[in-house]
């Protein structure tokens, strides 16, 4: 088992952990359809920034 050579201070430990906090994902509402989707992602209907970018067929 690994053993540390020198003890890390509380400050060093907390500074390392400062980026570990969880954040809620940012959601956007599509203007044309009103759907909610992740930022910079295509909506489930295939619309991105008001334009149809994925043509979903009748079988899907």
Curated annotation (Swiss-Prot):
Show the disulfide pairing.
none
Gene, per the UniProt record: rpmF
Q: Does the keyword Nucleus apply?
A: no
- What's a BP term from Gene Ontology annotated to this protein? translation
Under HAMAP family, the record lists: Ribosomal_bL32
One cellular component (GO) term of this entry:
large ribosomal subunit
Q: Where are stretches of biased composition, namely Basic and acidic residues? A: 11-22
What species does this protein belong to?
A: Ectopseudomonas mendocina (strain ymp) (Pseudomonas mendocina)
Q: Which UniProt keywords apply?
A: Ribonucleoprotein, Ribosomal protein
Q: Can you tell which superkingdom this protein's organism belongs to?
A: Bacteria
Q: Does the keyword Ribonucleoprotein apply?
A: yes
Q: Which family does it belong to?
A: Belongs to the bacterial ribosomal protein bL32 family.
Q: What's the protein here called?
A: Large ribosomal subunit protein bL32
Which parts of this chain are annotated as the region Disordered? 1-60
Q: Name one GO molecular function term.
A: structural constituent of ribosome
């Amino acid at each position: 088992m690994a053993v540390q050579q020198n003890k890390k201070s509380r400050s060093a430990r907390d500074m390392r952990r400062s980026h570990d906090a969880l954040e809620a994902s940012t959601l956007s509402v599509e203007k044309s359809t009103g759907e909610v989707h992740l930022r910079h992602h295509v909506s489930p209907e295939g619309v991105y920034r008001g334009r149809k970018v994925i043509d979903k067929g009748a079988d899907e």
